[in-house]
UniProtKB/Swiss-Prot annotation:
InterPro entries with a match to the protein in the record: ARM-type_fold, SAPS
Purpose of the protein: Regulatory subunit of protein phosphatase 6 (PP6). May function as a scaffolding PP6 subunit.
Name of the encoding gene: PPP6R3
Region described as Disordered: 628-659, 693-715, 729-755, 767-787, 840-873
PANTHER family: SERINE_THREONINE-PROTEIN PHOSPHATASE 6 REGULATORY SUBUNIT 3, SIT4 YEAST -ASSOCIATING PROTEIN-RELATED
Protein source organism: Gallus gallus
Subunit record text: Protein phosphatase 6 (PP6) holoenzyme is proposed to be a heterotrimeric complex formed by the catalytic subunit, a SAPS domain-containing subunit (PP6R) and an ankyrin repeat-domain containing regulatory subunit (ARS).
Listed GO MF terms: protein phosphatase binding; protein phosphatase regulator activity
Name by which UniProt lists this protein: Serine/threonine-protein phosphatase 6 regulatory subunit 3
Gene Ontology process terms (BP): regulation of signal transduction
Length: 873
């Protein structure tokens, strides 16, 4: 929305680019230069694509900024240059990848002496990496021509950005064939051997770490690629070279050469751990103890790697006994002399990984060296080192759950549960695991009884004891573990049994009880357990089985059919379209010249229905349709009626006849005022000549219905106003607020409805009635009115009225096309209330006036023939 309406402030860059002498630094000083570049600003990109601008951008990246500059702005232009070149603009990438002069200038950064500027190296690596990903063939061909590229990468491997560039070269090339060519090229350049040579005590720590991390990433990337491409015809040459025995032997010989360098040893062990990474299947009951990497066996360990490590196990064992020299460490707990150190911790991790392979030759070597006993001693010696405790716990869990052993030639032999598991026997007999657990537990309880602090390894010791108990009951070596416990001295065995039932049981109970008593949410899984525990007698077993079957069927159907179908709920747009389509099918054709049979049928139906009505009730029928007519002022109505003068003034005779129907013999300017506060128990019929009435004549009503006061002089307003017309209604004939107000329309003559025309004409001539004079002298005002056609439903009949709007007062005027008579609505007009036909039927036939002549009856009959039944507005 913000950009759509162009509400953002215009960039100053466009103004600068209009200058001919604008410089690159002036553009780089602008804050929004990066945004404009990424937004593909055409002028800016054309400026940056100039040869001198691209050379300056590359120069900012590879050249050291002056030392005398302020540190805050010293690397401003190199940073902006890097962002501009790596904004992933195709034109810039094409120019950099195609012009060899720019690539040579960029490549010259590697020719600098080590160590490189870390920040500039990151800029260089980022630019070259995006070029490798966008233009892999051009960049790889360029690098292959540079015979010293691999040498320079190895030279600057201590810089982390150069290590990232090497990994980008292996990962950013997605097509299989170009990637395979890059791997073969790097393998021919002996990249693996050169990285292994860096892991040497003579090299510095940064080079150790980056070389080790590079080799580890190469191993992981190669294995992942092998899993993704199952049908790969060519193996990964880098991984194959790294898994060779001579490479592993070279790596181990480097770290054990003369002096012991902790950085080199740790880096080499990290490479070995990556080579030994396998995802083994978890064993039951030891999920919490085993590391997440043991989920399943995905990678197979090359036996050449195991053989090379086995030959150097004695050297690793010596590291456990005599680690590299470390200074005494003072901690809050006490003095550590010597501390565990990273070297010994990684050696124990290596032993744990070797135990995961479960190779018999390696296990035999560990038994002879008593490496398990040494790490157990370290477990109880270093009370507060939880990293050490975790690795020892994993080693013991792996030994207890190792049912199979791999031979030296890689085959796996099945052992009987009572067979010889030498490593397990070594753990129980020589290492005396049970005795040491009991001694440590009793020592901790004694220390706590004296007010001392609980040992830090007690949690791990509890888990190890639970692991032994679980292996006794279940697990692949349950029989052997039970036999080994029985072979323990009787005193030790009794202490162990007492410990399992008392101390260990209480500890487990205490660990499983929630410390905070809160209201727990009831789980749905608990319901299933409750249902399963319900017992049934033997006689009802078949019935219960059948009930279970029915419940399964009902549950599956209930779950599938529960709720509402999504198809039943369409989008709002769909619903709107459907309703709109249906509206288009409705026929709005209205025919005002309907046959008189329809009106005759409705009149007969009304007569039938009225037989069931209470004739003597003055109360209003709530189910009866009310007719509303707006009685306007006479002059306005005449003016409105004159808009269609060609229809309403066909002849002087018709004009005279229709005008007489609306004239009052008393005063046409009289105004009617109705007291609405009178009680609503009145009965009257204010039928307008256009209304179709049923029943007897109404001429005998006379002036008793209305008692009018002396009319007031009319105001010279040019419009009939009824607001000042006062009418005194009797208490029983008060006007009802909800009485219908009729609208006058005309239609074809209908003879059956003209029987009582005489009474209607007599009523119109009564002095107390309200009359409206329809004249045609307002034709000059018709030019200011707008005419609109309006459709009015008259019962089952349809009529089209012309809606005329006065331009001055915006008064809506309804005009009938047939009758050429119109009514209008103004804010000052009153409602003329019409009583329904049933009141007229109750009036006696003597209401007809005595002076009604046959000529009047004939005119009224003719008029009523043109009247149609009014429908509600």
């Amino acid at each position: 929305m913000f950009w759509k309406f162009d509400l953002h402030s215009s960039s100053h860059i466009d103004t600068l680019l209009e200058r001919e002498d604008v410089t690159l630094k002036e553009l780089m000083d602008e804050e929004d230069v990066l945004q404009e570049c990424k937004a593909q600003n055409r002028k800016l990109i054309e400026f940056l694509l100039k040869s001198e601008c691209l050379e300056d951008l590359v120069s900012f990246i590879i050249e050291e900024p002056p030392q005398d500059m302020d540190e805050k702005i010293r690397y401003k232009y190199p940073n902006i240059s890097c962002e501009l070149l790596t904004s992933d603009v195709s034109q810039i990438n094409d120019r950099l990848g195609e012009e060899e002069s720019l690539l040579m200038k960029l490549y010259s950064f590697l020719l600098n002496e080590s160590p490189l500027n870390p920040l500039l190296a990151s800029f260089f690596s980022k630019v070259l990496s995006i070029l490798i990903s966008r233009k892999p063939e051009q960049i790889v061909d360029f690098l292959k021509k540079k015979h010293d590229f691999v040498d320079l990468v190895i030279k600057h491997i201590g810089t982390s950005a150069i290590m990232d560039l090497l990994l980008r070269l292996l990962t950013c090339i997605e097509p299989p064939q170009p990637r395979q060519e890059v791997l073969n090229w790097l393998n021919e350049e002996r990249i693996i051997q050169r990285l292994v040579e860096i892991v040497h005590p003579s090299q510095d720590e940064d080079r150790h770490s980056n070389a080790s991390q590079s080799l580890c990433e190469i191993i992981r990337l190669s294995r992942d690629q092998m899993l993704q491409v199952q049908n790969s015809s060519e193996p990964d040459p880098l991984l194959a070279s790294l898994e060779k025995r001579e490479i592993i032997e070279q790596l181990l010989s480097n770290i054990f050469h003369k002096e012991k360098n902790e950085s080199a040893i740790v880096s080499a062990i990290q490479i070995l751990l990556t080579l030994l990474e396998t995802r083994r299947q978890t064993f039951e009951g030891h999920i919490e103890i085993c590391p997440p990497g043991m989920s399943n066996s995905t990678y197979s360990v090359n036996k050449s790697v195991l053989e090379a490590i086995k030959a150097r196990l004695s050297s690793f064992h010596e590291l456990l006994l005599e680690p590299p020299k470390k200074s005494v460490m003072k901690t809050t707990w006490g003095v550590l002399d010597p501390p565990v150190g990273n070297t010994r911790l990684n050696v124990i991790r290596l032993i744990s990984s070797l135990l995961q392979t479960n190779t018999s030759s390696v296990n035999q070597e560990l038994i002879e060296l008593n490496s398990i006993g040494v790490i157990l001693d370290m477990f109880f010696k270093y009370t507060w080192n939880n990293f050490l405790h975790t690795q020892v716990e994993i080693c013991i869990a792996l030994i207890l759950a190792s049912p199979l052993e791999s031979t030296e030639n890689g085959t796996i032999t099945d052992q009987d549960s009572t067979g010889d598991n030498l490593l397990l026997k070594h753990l129980f007999l020589k290492c005396q695991l049970i005795e040491r657990i009991l001694e440590a537990w009793e020592m901790n309880e004694k220390k706590q009884a004296e007010g001392g602090r609980r040992h830090g390894y007690m949690g791990h010791l509890t888990r190890i004891a639970n692991c032994i108990v679980h292996s006794t009951d279940k697990g692949p070596n349950s029989t052997l573990v039970q036999q080994l416990i029985k072979e323990l001295p009787e005193e030790v065995r009794e202490r162990w049994e007492t410990f399992c039932t008392s101390s260990l049981g209480e500890t487990n109970k205490r660990n499983t009880v929630d410390l905070v008593t809160t209201c727990h949410i009831h789980s749905s899984s608990d319901d299933e357990i409750d249902f399963k525990e319900t017992g049934f007698s033997q006689d009802s077993s078949l019935q219960q089985a059948f009930s279970d079957y029915q419940m399964q069927q009902m549950t599956s159907n209930f779950i599938d059919q529960f709720g509402f179908n999504d198809e039943k709920f369409a989008d709002q747009d769909d619903i709107g379209n459907v309703s709109f389509d249906r509206v288009s099918d409705i026929n709005f054709t209205l025919n005002t010249n309907e046959s008189g049979n329809i009106a005759l049928f409705e009149a007969c139906c009304k007569e039938r229905i009225q037989q069931f009505d209470d004739g003597g009730s003055d109360e209003e029928d709530i189910w009866e349709e009310k007719h509303i007519a707006f009685t306007p002022e006479s002059q306005r109505r005449s003016s409105s009626g004159s808009t269609d003068s060609e229809e309403s003034t066909d002849s002087e005779e018709e004009d005279g006849t229709k005008q007489d129907l609306f004239e009052s013999h008393a005063n046409t300017e009289d105004k009617m005022e109705v007291d609405l506060n009178e009680p609503p128990n009145w009965s009257a019929n204010f039928d307008v000549p256009m209304e179709t009435a049923h029943g007897t004549n109404l001429d005998s009503v006379g002036s008793d219905v209305w008692s009018t006061e002396e009319p007031m002089p009319a105001k010279e307003t040019g419009w009939a106003s009824f607001s000042e017309f006062t009418s005194s209604l009797s208490s029983t004939d008060s006007l009802r607020s909800n009485s219908p107000v009729e609208m006058e329309t005309n239609t074809e003559p209908m003879d059956p409805l003209s029987a009582n025309a005489t009474g209607l004409a007599t009523q119109l001539e009564t002095p107390g009635s309200v009359a409206m004079e329809a004249s045609s002298d307002g034709e000059e005002d018709a030019e200011n009115a707008d005419k609109v056609t309006e459709t009015v439903m008259n019962g089952s009949m349809k009529e089209t009225l012309s809606l005329t709007v006065d331009a001055k007062t915006e008064t809506a005027v309804f005009k009938s096309e047939e009758g050429k008579l119109s009514t209008s609505q103004d804010a000052s007009c009153k409602y003329v209330v019409e009583e329904n036909a049933e009141v007229a039927e109750e009036a006696p036939s003597a209401l007809q006036p005595a002076n009604s002549s046959p000529e009047q009856r004939t005119d009224q009959r003719t008029l009523l023939g043109e009247t149609s039944v009014n429908g509600p507005v």
